[in-house]
Regions:
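Residue-level recognition of short, solvent-exposed, well-ordered loop/turn junctions
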Residues: 6, 51-53, 61
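Glycine- and acidic-residue-biased ligand/ion/polar-headgroup-sensing regions
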Residues: 18-38
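Double-stranded beta-helix
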Residues: 37-52, 67-100
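Conserved hydrophobic/aromatic beta-strand scaffold that supports enzyme active sites
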Residues: 2-4, 22, 57-59
Length: 100
């Protein structure tokens, strides 16, 4: 599917059990933030067009908690996942600066 985000869009941390997902940047820039089970960030994948030197295509093949932060005014991705998504996603509270 094609997804277009506007800066300020809120994508809460979530994961997809039994699913893989891949993202391909069409335009704009965004970060994929991965979290551990306690809600602490473990990795940030900065995505952008090839000329930007950032990651163009990202694939996640495990049920890892993740969120998206839009870095440009707009960003569009082609997202591919296997199967249908459940109506309700798992969510985790994000821990900021060591506070819960």
């Amino acid at each position: 599917m094609i997804i277009v985000f506007h800066r300020g869009a809120v994508i809460r941390p979530h994961r997809h059990r039994g699913k893989t997902e891949s993202y391909h940047i069409i335009f704009g820039e965004l970060d994929i933030v991965r979290f551990d089970d306690e809600g602490l960030p473990t990795r940030i994948v900065s995505m952008g067009k090839l000329a930007s030197g950032k990651t163009l295509v990202y694939r996640q093949n495990r049920p890892i908690w993740h969120s998206v932060i839009i870095r440009s005014e707009y960003a569009a991705i082609h997202e591919v996942t296997n199967g249908t998504l459940p109506r309700r996603r798992e969510r985790v509270r994000t821990v900021v600066a060591g506070r819960r």
